[in-house]
Structure formats: structure tokens, C-alpha cells
């Protein structure tokens, strides 16, 4: 983009603002007619007149934009202004129109950025982000390929508005510093008239002599200057008039005709000049007599009296510099004096007055928009909260002025920081609220939509919703789809756009006759359909929603905005190294996940003026357990993350020390210790405001991390440390978020399950899903803890029940306060993309705090939803899976929704003729299973009761491949020795876990090992499993109703005693089955019967025992390596104490697999 650089005798040209043309462009300021009118500054636009009804200011702005051809992209630069009250309307303000009301509003560009045109070399240019510029960052030079801020229609409107503002003195001329400066300003104003008249002539395609006689410079200069000229003598007025005509003619001949200057160039030049000619052009200044700048530890009030006179302060908001404040300066006038001596004295006096007021007149920076987290309005008092917990409070003249002020800051925030967020609910634009609820973007361009799809994986059916850049009544849906081509092997990825039409509040897909009352309803309908276009068919899957501070063409790139762009985490580890000689280890404080916690002292040596001073700093030492040195890298990654942050509510990391085999994280010592313990101790004295302060401080820290795109990964009350109790003081509590410890990416699945419900559900499925969204889930759970005084949610649940809790998409029971419950529910959404941004969380917590809900009396959480209880009416039988003497197992679908989408489960129940003993056995089996959690043990899902609780069914996961006994013969060609040994390792791991919990299985056989996949097996059927008493090494069976004797160890057959070593014997038999592919001719029963001969009843057991005493064992299976058979034989030692262990077997098999 190129702009004109005009050099003229009139030294008045160089900046930006707003203009008018001809008599027709003058806005009628007579008393308004009844009704509501929206006035435009364009000469060819009739005012927008509204009929009876209810409208929002945003609605009217859209209508006005359509009337003036302003694009949806530039529409958010405009707002409605009431010249009578001198107030702007917030976008959500409701206007009720009836016959009695009379209101005139002006449609104006409100949000302005100086040097948007790039013609001022002394100031950084301003542009819209474009896909090309996104990677390059901010450049000091002009960017020829950057996207301009304004479109043609917006520029035209701004030009007309600028003329009006200059003439009507809405944009006041800057104050002259000297008399000569006053003359220069007058010349600049005449130069503006030259530009305006030249533009008018070019638009009308007229030569200067052809212009109407009433087109005079007087109509294009400020009314105050025009009045001043009229008061001068006739000769002076004639001289000004002749000089202006000569200059206009010369400008036309030398510049307009010779340089091929366009009307666009003249508009840009006029507006650029307006920026330097006027005072604070594009800025809004608010006056207050009460101003407070504060942080959590200090306050600075500015509302004192000066000798009985109230001191006023000014707060200025500009697009380029953000929010600034100062004392309101005294007005210093320049008096005209012909006498040179007296004039010099006056100028000296003026300089002295200027120096006196210099300090008062200087603007102090408070904040640029991306720093702001939320804004609160209470009547006429506005509180602006920053990320560093500093706050500005100012009292304005009315609630309406407060809304006007906040809507200004909120609008600039969306233009510079985050296009899809609002800072204050009181001024929330309805369209932004709609977009957030529906995951819809503003009018981002196609390139950004496609880039977003690519960044999120470009899976088929993934889509982006976005408003059209050109039409207010259309939403575009950009979808990833794949076109299969006969010419090209495989499918070609394509991005297709679909148009959604919005008419009279209803939504429909272009080309479809069916419409819906909301965008959400339409999308729900479309997701069930197969969409077709250009020989491509697909189904919609996942919507890519707006993300916090996402870069797009909706954002304006100013110098300050670029400074606040997220700095993404360093790819390399970075932290300060601490020497071991500088650390003194203190007492042991406890254990973390794979770490030991100690108090300690850090010796800090400072060289002050040649003298070395030793300072002792109290610290916490987190020592990685030397047995887990394999995860040292993950430990250092956590330290590196903490090294990148600096926030008052996050614990400070001094550095890392490597001491011999120990890796140590050295952190700030926080006096009050973990928050959960403190809340338990002080639960009786904790108040609602106290809890809200804790929640806000945590949200502030997490919002800071979100802005830096950093993930904590372990947010909970035990990781919140209390630096100040704040129960008896006005300051309140002060908390610090500690380090996350070992990242979940290196934790076992069991360790992840233990962290339910703090860990996000998607991270349980795959720890690689860890993202900022996971911290939002954790925040919701931590908010629950804070509400209930540090109570532990799901504390009585077993691991299997916790896992089921997530599988059933449950949440902890929320408090009775509806708004607080809603916030927790939104944070704990099972769709990570639906969780709110932390800025929105902070805003909502502050809004909720105003209501002061009672969250203290909720002493104990209500009963949790039990996801392990299955209702009988939703169990739909599919087929039988197996049957025994007393029970059976069925395949069922648990389908509470009634749409055949429920999960398939295995249901074990007793036959009707079974007696009370069998019911007790099934209950014992259920109790055992619900306490077991291992990847190689079949999962317990719950129970189903019937007959008033007398009947019971056991619900387990269904593994469709069946048992090894069924699976191996059918898949013999796919299963080699290596895979057989892997199965053996998995069975041993499951049995080793079972033994560690003091259980004996008593029925380990191939028929009871189930196949989850080609690569994983699980131990099932715990009907005979028994618990060994703590003071014994074995379990004695009272009966042998259905004992699998050919898998039993000798002590089981002779004495009915079952040791863990007895399961080892059974494993050896199972391994034999595994290596013979469960061939019926080679089954343990078939082979043992060949050894002992025909027999039946108790004689079978007697002969089997004698055979085993003789040292006879099952033979080596065909093609079984001797090393494997030797491991098998170690399982069959006659004495239990001589047998190998499951741990030794695991090591032996793994050595063979290497």
C-alpha cells in the first residue's frame, strides 16, 4: 500500500482523523423528530429511522454498517454516540422505541489507531494481522504486504466524520505554545480546507473554476477559527481569501493535475494531518475526582483537596497506548501582544507556567489492553484489573458514563488482544456472546480458517465456523474433506466452504429449505447428515473453536500489541544451576510423586562494594528419588517451566542442583504450607470472601500461564501454598501455586487414575493430550475443594470406581449456589474445547463474588453420583457368553439413552436355583474386583441389584475376542513364540499385582485369560479368588465344589491350602496351554489322564498326587525352546517355597524377548 507524501508551503500536513463535504454533508442539529434516528456523516445517506420495537445498540450498528457499506471486518470500529449526553452506547444496550420517545444518535467510528496510514515516519505503523505477517512478527519498517486497517467504505466514512469533527470542533485544535505557533495552526486549518475542496472537486469531476460560489474555505475550517476571522478587519479577511484562492489553484495545478493524485490519497492526507493538528485525536478522556491505583499489598489514592479545591484527574484511552492517567492540567492561555518587550515577558511567563505544570501534565501509563484480565462496574465506579493484580478504580459521573467508558476499553481489548472475549458482562456484545456459545469465529479470512484446521490436525469432517467478511447475514463453515481420485493414489485433502444463511433470527444451510431457531440446533442437525459437494461426501465431526488470544485478521497490530503477543515456551531446558556446597538440607517434610521433600537453606553470596556478604535463604528442596533417575529429563522439564514464569501467585524457583546421584529442585519456602491442610484446621472460621480471594488468585496465576501457553498439569489445593492466612486482616489470604512435580506424561496409568477427579479425562485416555484445557478442568475440581474446605472428592472410591466415574462422564456434586455450580460445570466439561478461558473465569468469579453467595454453610458434599450402579431396565441382553453349574455370563448392552449407542458389558449372574452360599460368593467376588486395578486384570464396571437388593449381578468389561482357549486355536498363524511370551509376561504382571494385594486366584487357566487385543490379555473370572489373612501365608478351602484339579498344585490337592506359590504352579500349566495353542489333544487334562490312566471321582486326585510326587510333569510342548521349558519347570517344584516367583518369571521372559 502506498500513500501520498505532499510537500507544500502550508506546513500543516502529517497525521489522521475525520472530514465532511459540501452543504449537504452538514448534519442537521435541529430538535429531533419523534422516534429514533441514526445519523450518518455521508452526504448521500438518509438517516436510519426506526419503527416501534426493541433493539440493541449492536443491532443498530449492523444496520448502519449495511447502509454505509461498512464491512463486517470494520464494523467493530464503530459505535453509537449521543451528542446531547456526550455518551456512547454499549453494544448490549437495549433501546425501546415507541411513539413518545425522541432520540437522535450518531453512527461514528469510535475505535481509532493513529498512523494506521503509515505516513508518519516517527511512529510505528498500524495494520491488521495477515497470514503472511503472522510468522514474521513486528517490523519497524513499513510493511508493503500488510493488510490495511480500513476498507474503502470505512475510509470514506472516517473522512466525512473527520471533516465534521474539525468544523464542529469535536476534535479540538491543539493549543498554541507561542503566538507564531498560533499563526502556523491557522495556516494548517486553511491547508485542510484545500484538501477538502480539492477532494470535493475530484469526486464531482469538476474543475476549480466550475465549483459553486458557495464552496468557500470558511465551510471547511473550525467554526471557532471562522468566527475569529470574521472579527478581523476587511483587508485582513480579503488577504486571507486571496491567499487561499492562490494556494488552492497552485495545489490543483502542481499536485492534483501533475502527480495523478487520487481521492484516496487526499482522504489519507487529510486524516493524517488531522492527527497532528488536533489534541489527542481519536482519544477519549474521562474526568474523575476519585482515582485509586492499587495492588494486593499497597494502595495509592488520588482524591485529595488542594486548599479546599477538589483536584481532578483525567484518564485517557487510546488505541495505540492503552489506558493512561494524570492530574488535570491548568489552562495556560497565550495572550497576543504587539509590543516586542511585553510579548517576550509574556512568553517567559508562559514558559515558567508550563514548567510548573509539566509534572502534572505528564501522562502515566496504567495498562495496555492485553494486560487487562477483567473489569467490574459498581454503579458509577469502575475497577480495571490487570494480570499483575494491579487495579485502577475511578468514579465517574454516572452509571451510564461508566458503561460508556468500559465499552471503550472492552472494544479495544477485542481489537488488540482477543477478538472472542469480553472483559465485563455489563457491556458484553450479544454477537460475541453468541459466538462463544456456538464456537463461532468473527469474520476471519479463509486463509486463517484453513491455517487453523491445519494446526488442529486437518482430520476429515473437522470444521471452522466464521462470520462472512463481506455479508452480515452469512456464516461460513470451512470443512476439511478428502476427495478420492482414480488418477491419484489415495485421497486428496481439500477445504470446502459452506454458507449458512441467517434470516430473521433463523439459520439454514444455503440450498436447504429447512431452518432452525439457533446455530446450535442447525449444527446438531448437520452432524447427523452426510454432506455432499463436488463428488465429495463426509460427515461433520469436530468444531475448531476460537482460542484465547488467537492471531487473525480481526486483530490490529500496534507496537504495544506486538509486545504482548504470547511468547511460546522454550524448546530447550533452561534453569539456574545451584552448587551443592551452597545448599544445606534440613528435615524431611514428606513425599511427593517419586520425590522427597526437605526443608533447606540456600547460601547466597553477594559482593557489595568489595565486601562479600553471606545471606541465608530458607528454601524447599524437592529431591527426585534416585531409583527414578530414568525420569530425570521430565523432572528438569518441570523445573524449566517454572523458570519461565514470574508471577506473584506462583512459587519462585531458585534453580536446580545436581548432587551426586540426586537431582534437586530448589524453591521458595512458603510459610503457611499446603492450603488443604490449613482449610481442614480452620474450617470453622473461613468466610465466603476469603474463599473467593483464594479462587481469584489461583485463576490469576493460571490466566498468566495460559497467556504464555504454559501448562501446569497438577492444580489442586495441596499444591497451593499459603503465604498469608489473612483471616483476621483486611488484606485477606495470599496463596502461591507450587510446581507441578513429575509431569503426568511419565506417570503410569494407575498413577493417573489416582489423580481423578483433578486430572482431565482426556489426559487419562492419553497423557499426550495435556494442554491448557486440562488446567481448566483441574481448576474446577480445586474450586470444589475450596468450597468444601479442602475435602477430597471421591476419597472413598477405588481406582476402578474412579475410572468408571469418568467413563460415565460424571462430575462431583456441585454446591447449591447455581452460579458457582455453573462455573464448575463449565470448567469440568468433558469436551476440552468447550472449557472457558481463564480470563472469562476471572470475570465470572468477580461477578459471582458481587452476589456474595453462601458457600460456607456447605460443610459436607452431598452424596456423589455412583457411576458403578447399573439400572436393570437399561441392560439389554444380546447373547450368552458362558455358563457354569451355578452361574452364567451374558453379553448385554447398557443403553440408558435408548438409542443402541450404549456400551457392551459382560454381566455375571447366578442361576435362579443357586443358594445363599453362592450369593455370598458372588458378593465376595464383586468386593475383590472393585478393589483391583491393573492393565492385565479385567475391569470391574459395577453392579446391578434386583429383587429389593436380594439379587445381584456383576458388570464387567466385555472383551469380544474371548479367552485364550478360544482365541489361540483360531489365530495360530498370527501368533508366534514372541507374542506368546509377551502374553506370558502380561499374565505374570497381573498375577504379581494380585499377589501384592494378598489375593490368590485359585483358577488361573487359559479359559480364564481374556484377550483384549492381539497385543494384550487380561486375567478374568475371580469366582474362586480368596484373600489370604494377614497373619497367614495361605488360604484353606472349606469345600471343593468345582475345583480345576489338573491346574492345581500338590498342596491344594492334598491339604486344600492355597499359597501365592500355588498360583505360580497354575501359571506353569497355563503357560503350557499357551505354547500348545490350547490344542485339545495337548490339554493338561488329556496329558495327565494319559499318565494316570482311566479313573474317576476322588481316585483321580489320589492318582494325580502320586504322579506328581514321582516327579512327573507335563512334557515340553512342540517347538518350545528349552530356556522357556526350564522356566515352566521352575513353576512345578513340589514344595511351594522352592518355586520361582512371578517377579522372577517376568525378568526371565523379558530377558528372552530382548
Swiss-Prot record:
Task: List residues of the Protein kinase domain.
Answer: 583-855, 875-1153
Concerning PTM, the database record says: Autophosphorylated. Phosphorylated by TYK2 on tyrosine residues in response to type-I interferon signaling, leading to its activation. Phosphorylated on tyrosine residues in response to interferon gamma signaling. Dephosphorylation of Tyr-1034 and Tyr-1035 by PTPN2 negatively regulates cytokine-mediated signaling. Ubiquitinated by RNF125; leading to its degradation by the proteasome.
Q: Give the sites modified to Phosphoserine.
A: 228
Phosphotyrosine PTM positions: 3, 1034-1035
Q: Which PROSITE patterns does the record match to this protein?
A: FERM_3, PROTEIN_KINASE_ATP, PROTEIN_KINASE_DOM, PROTEIN_KINASE_TYR, SH2
- SH2 domain residues are 439-544
Q: Where N-acetylmethionine occurs, residue numbers?
A: 1
Q: What does this protein do?
A: Tyrosine kinase of the non-receptor type, involved in the IFN-alpha/beta/gamma signal pathway. Kinase partner for the interleukin (IL)-2 receptor as well as interleukin (IL)-10 receptor. Kinase partner for the type I interferon receptor IFNAR2. In response to interferon-binding to IFNAR1-IFNAR2 heterodimer, phosphorylates and activates its binding partner IFNAR2, creating docking sites for STAT proteins. Directly phosphorylates STAT proteins but also activates STAT signaling through the transactivation of other JAK kinases associated with signaling receptors.
Question: What name is this protein filed under?
Answer: Tyrosine-protein kinase JAK1
* Taxonomic classification: Eukaryota, Metazoa, Chordata, Craniata, Vertebrata
Amino acid at each position: 500500500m502506498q500513500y501520498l507524501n505532499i510537500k507544500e508551503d502550508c506546513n500543516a500536513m502529517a497525521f489522521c482523523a475525520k472530514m465532511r463535504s459540501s452543504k449537504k454533508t452538514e448534519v442537521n442539529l435541529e430538535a429531533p423528530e419523534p422516534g429514533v434516528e441514526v445519523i450518518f456523516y455521508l452526504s448521500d445517506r438518509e438517516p436510519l429511522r426506526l419503527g416501534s420495537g426493541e433493539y440493541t445498540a449492536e443491532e443498530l450498528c449492523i444496520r448502519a454498517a449495511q447502509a454505509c457499506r461498512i464491512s463486517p471486518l470494520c464494523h467493530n470500529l464503530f459505535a453509537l454516540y449521543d451528542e446531547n449526553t456526550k455518551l456512547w452506547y454499549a453494544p448490549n444496550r437495549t433501546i425501546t422505541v415507541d411513539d413518545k420517545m425522541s432520540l437522535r444518535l450518531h453512527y461514528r467510528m469510535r475505535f481509532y489507531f493513529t498512523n494506521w496510514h503509515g505516513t508518519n515516519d516517527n511512529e510505528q505503523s498500524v495494520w491488521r494481522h495477515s497470514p503472511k505477517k503472522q510468522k514474521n512478527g513486528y517490523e519497524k519498517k513499513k510493511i508493503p504486504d500488510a493488510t490495511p486497517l480500513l476498507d474503502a467504505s470505512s475510509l470514506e466514512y472516517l473522512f466525512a466524520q473527520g471533516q465534521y469533527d474539525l468544523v464542529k470542533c469535536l476534535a479540538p485544535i491543539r493549543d498554541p505554545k507561542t503566538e507564531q505557533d498560533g499563526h502556523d495552526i491557522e495556516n494548517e486549518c486553511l491547508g485542510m480546507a484545500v484538501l477538502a475542496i480539492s477532494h470535493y472537486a475530484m469526486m464531482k469531476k469538476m474543475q476549480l473554476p466550475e465549483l459553486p460560489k458557495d464552496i468557500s474555505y470558511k465551510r471547511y475550517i473550525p467554526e471557532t477559527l471562522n468566527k475569529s476571522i470574521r472579527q478581523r478587519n476587511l483587508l485582513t479577511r480579503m488577504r486571507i481569501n486571496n491567499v487561499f484562492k492562490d494556494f488552492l489553484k497552485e495545489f490543483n495545478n502542481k499536485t492534483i493535475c501533475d502527480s495523478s493524485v487520487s481521492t484516496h490519497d487526499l482522504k489519507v492526507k487529510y486524516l493524517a494531518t488531522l492527527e497532528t493538528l488536533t489534541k489527542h485525536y481519536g482519544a477519549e478522556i474521562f474526568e474523575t475526582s476519585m482515582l485509586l491505583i492499587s495492588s494486593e499489598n499497597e494502595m495509592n489514592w488520588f482524591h485529595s483537596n488542594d486548599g479546599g479545591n477538589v483536584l481532578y484527574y483525567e484518564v485517557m484511552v487510546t488505541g495505540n497506548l492503552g489506558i493512561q492517567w494524570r492530574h488535570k492540567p491548568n489552562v495556560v492561555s497565550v495572550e497576543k501582544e504587539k509590543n516586542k518587550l511585553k510579548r517576550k515577558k509574556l512568553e517567559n511567563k508562559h514558559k515558567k507556567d508550563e514548567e510548573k505544570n509539566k509534572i502534572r501534565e505528564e501522562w502515566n501509563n496504567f495498562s495496555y489492553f492485553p494486560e487487562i484480565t477483567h473489569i467490574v462496574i459498581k454503579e458509577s465506579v469502575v475497577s480495571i484489573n490487570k494480570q499483575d493484580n494491579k487495579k485502577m478504580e475511578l468514579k465517574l459521573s454516572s452509571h451510564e458514563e461508566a458503561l460508556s467508558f468500559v465499552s471503550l476499553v472492552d472494544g479495544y481489548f477485542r481489537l488488540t488482544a482477543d477478538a472472542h472475549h469480553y472483559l465485563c458482562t455489563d457491556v458484553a456484545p450479544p454477537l460475541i456472546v453468541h459466538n462463544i456459545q456456538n464456537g463461532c469465529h468473527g469474520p476471519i479470512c479463509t486463509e486463517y480458517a484453513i491455517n487453523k484446521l491445519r494446526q488442529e490436525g486437518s482430520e476429515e469432517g473437522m470444521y471452522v465456523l466464521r462470520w462472512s467478511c463481506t455479508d452480515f447475514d452469512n456464516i461460513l463453515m470451512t470443512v476439511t474433506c478428502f476427495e478420492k481420485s482414480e488418477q491419484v493414489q489415495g485421497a486428496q485433502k481439500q477445504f470446502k466452504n459452506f454458507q449458512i444463511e441467517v434470516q430473521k433470527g433463523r439459520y439454514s444451510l444455503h440450498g436447504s429449505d429447512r431452518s432452525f431457531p439457533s446455530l446450535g440446533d442447525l449444527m446438531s442437525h448437520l452432524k447427523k447428515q452426510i454432506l455432499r459437494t463436488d463428488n465429495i461426501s463426509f460427515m461433520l465431526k469436530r468444531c475448531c473453536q476460537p482460542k484465547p488470544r488467537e492471531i487473525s485478521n480481526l486483530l490490529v497490530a500496534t507496537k504495544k500489541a506486538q509486545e504482548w503477543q504470547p511468547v511460546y515456551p522454550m524448546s530447550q531446558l533452561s534453569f539456574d544451576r545451584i552448587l551443592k556446597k551452597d545448599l544445606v538440607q534440613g528435615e524431611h517434610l514428606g513425599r511427593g510423586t517419586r520425590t522427597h521433600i526437605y526443608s533447606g537453606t540456600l547460601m547466597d553470596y553477594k559482593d557489595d562494594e568489595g565486601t562479600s556478604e553471606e545471606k541465608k535463604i530458607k528454601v524447599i528442596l524437592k529431591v527426585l528419588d534416585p531409583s527414578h533417575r530414568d525420569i530425570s529429563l521430565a523432572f528438569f522439564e518441570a523445573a524449566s517451566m517454572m523458570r519461565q514464569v514470574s508471577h506473584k501467585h506462583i512459587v519462585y524457583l531458585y534453580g536446580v542442583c545436581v548432587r551426586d546421584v540426586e537431582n534437586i529442585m530448589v524453591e521458595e519456602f512458603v510459610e503457611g504450607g499446603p492450603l488443604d491442610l490449613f482449610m481442614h484446621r480452620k474450617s470453622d472460621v473461613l468466610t465466603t470472601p476469603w474463599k473467593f480471594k483464594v479462587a481469584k488468585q489461583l485463576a490469576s496465576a493460571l490466566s498468566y500461564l495460559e497467556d504464555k501457553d504454559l501448562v501446569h498439569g497438577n492444580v489442586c489445593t495441596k499444591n497451593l501454598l499459603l503465604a498469608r492466612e489473612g483471616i483476621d486482616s483486611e488484606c485477606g489470604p495470599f496463596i502461591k501455586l507450587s510446581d507441578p512435580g513429575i509431569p503426568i506424561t511419565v506417570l503410569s496409568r494407575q498413577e493417573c487414575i489416582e489423580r481423578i477427579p483433578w486430572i482431565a479425562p482426556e489426559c487419562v485416555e492419553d497423557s499426550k493430550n495435556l494442554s491448557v484445557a486440562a488446567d481448566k478442568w483441574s481448576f474446577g475440581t480445586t474450586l470444589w475443594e475450596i468450597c468444601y474446605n479442602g475435602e477430597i472428592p471421591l476419597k472413598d472410591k477405588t481406582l476402578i470406581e474412579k475410572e468408571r466415574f469418568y467413563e460415565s462422564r460424571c462430575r462431583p456434586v456441585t454446591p447449591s449456589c447455581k452460579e458457582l455450580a455453573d462455573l464448575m460445570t463449565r470448567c469440568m466439561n468433558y469436551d476440552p474445547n468447550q472449557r472457558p478461558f481463564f480470563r472469562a473465569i476471572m470475570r465470572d468469579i468477580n461477578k459471582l463474588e458481587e452476589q456474595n453467595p453462601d458457600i460456607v454453610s456447605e460443610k459436607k458434599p452431598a452424596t456423589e453420583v455412583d457411576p458403578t450402579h447399573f439400572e436393570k431396565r437399561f441392560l439389554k441382553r444380546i447373547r450368552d457368553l458362558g455358563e457354569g453349574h451355578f452361574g452364567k455370563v451374558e453379553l448385554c448392552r447398557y443403553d440408558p439413552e435408548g438409542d443402541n449407542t450404549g456400551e457392551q458389558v459382560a454381566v455375571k449372574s447366578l442361576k435362579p436355583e443357586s443358594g445363599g452360599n453362592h450369593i455370598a460368593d458372588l458378593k465376595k467376588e464383586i468386593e475383590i474386583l472393585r478393589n483391583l486395578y491393573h492393565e492385565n486384570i479385567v475391569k470391574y464396571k459395577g453392579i446391578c441389584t434386583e429383587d429389593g437388593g436380594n439379587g445381584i449381578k456383576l458388570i464387567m468389561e466385555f472383551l469380544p475376542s474371548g479367552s485364550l482357549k478360544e482365541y489361540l486355536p483360531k489365530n495360530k498363524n498370527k501368533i508366534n513364540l514372541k507374542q506368546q511370551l509377551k502374553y506370558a509376561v502380561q499374565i505374570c504382571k497381573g498375577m504379581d499385582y494380585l499377589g501384592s494385594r494378598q489375593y490368590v486366584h485359585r483358577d488361573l487357566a487359559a479359559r480364564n485369560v481374556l484377550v483384549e487385543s492381539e497385543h494384550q490379555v487380561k486375567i478374568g473370572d475371580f469366582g474362586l479368588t480368596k484373600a489370604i489373612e494377614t497373619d497367614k501365608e495361605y488360604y484353606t478351602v472349606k469345600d471343593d465344589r468345582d475345583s480345576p484339579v489338573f491346574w492345581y498344585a500338590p498342596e491344594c490337592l492334598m491339604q486344600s491350602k492355597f499359597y501365592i506359590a500355588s498360583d505360580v504352579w497354575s501359571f506353569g500349566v497355563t503357560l503350557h496351554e499357551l505354547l500348545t495353542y490350547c490344542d485339545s489333544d495337548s490339554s493338561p487334562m488329556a496329558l495327565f489322564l494319559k499318565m494316570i490312566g482311566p479313573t474317576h471321582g476322588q481316585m483321580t486326585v489320589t492318582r494325580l498326587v502320586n504322579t506328581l510326587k514321582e516327579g512327573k510333569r507335563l512334557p515340553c510342548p512342540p517347538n518350545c525352546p528349552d530356556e522357556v521349558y526350564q522356566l515352566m519347570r521352575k513353576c512345578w517344584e513340589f514344595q511351594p517355597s522352592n518355586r520361582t516367583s512371578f517377579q522372577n518369571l517376568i525378568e526371565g521372559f523379558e530377558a528372552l524377548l530382548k
